[in-house]
Amino acid sequence: MVIFSYTDSCYRSNPVKPGDAEALLKPYGLTIDPAEAQDFHTLLAAVHDCAESVAALPDYQPVPDQTKYPREDVRRPSEKEQVFGQAWAHRFLIRGNPQGGPLAGKSISLKDVIAVAGVPQLLGSDIIPSWTPSTDATVVTRLLEAGADIHGTSTCENMCHSTSSYTSAQGTVENPNAQGYSAGGSTSGGAALVAAGIVDITIGGDQGGSIRVPASFCGCKMSFLLEDKCVTS
């Protein structure tokens, strides 16, 4: 749920004008009820002003402590290193908190949409150049502080837009319990890795089944909690 606010002053310099919504919809054969036209104009104007306010805020990027948590041997895995087709996106090692923690000794893989500073992100695609984050996602920081060791990023489906496991530009991911069959998606590589016991935990993201589907295909229990042999979000 998103709520936008507006004031009368927003209209004085706002580029959204009456009739803009109707003009945008016309090529698609869609119309707006004239009785609702003003409401749509008000909403779009408010969205614009809210977006402008957010865009004007100073950027904040937390700087990861790469002295405490160095990234070791970041690489695209060799054919010999790969498992279940192309389950790994990148291999590397970031050792967790040397003082230990509740996840000490646990091995982690991260879906290749989760930012890790210094590790290129493929997003299962080849239509855009890989992007290398300069900061760690919050979940990465929390895992390391809790003592977990991160062993790499796992292959996800192309732009995460599939619940299969054959759309990634980096290659297919096979089901560890039935090789040659789908591992599900879009957290395809992560589900295969944790189901096979190669890592203890994999971290994914789920808006439309991207954890639930591969977890069910690979025989894992997905959870928002800490469970044995689970794919978590």
Language-model regions: role of each:
Residues 1-3, 28:
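Terminal signal-anchor or tail-anchor transmembrane helices
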Residues 3-14:
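Extended, non-globular alpha-helical segments
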Residues 12-19, 26, 31-203, 207:
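Gly/Ser-rich catalytic/binding loops embedded in alpha/beta enzyme cores
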Residues 168-171, 218-222:
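Short, hinge-like loop/turn segments at secondary-structure boundaries
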Residues 212-217:
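Structural signature of FAD isoalloxazine-binding scaffolds in flavoprotein oxidoreductases
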Residues 227-233:
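A short core secondary-structure module
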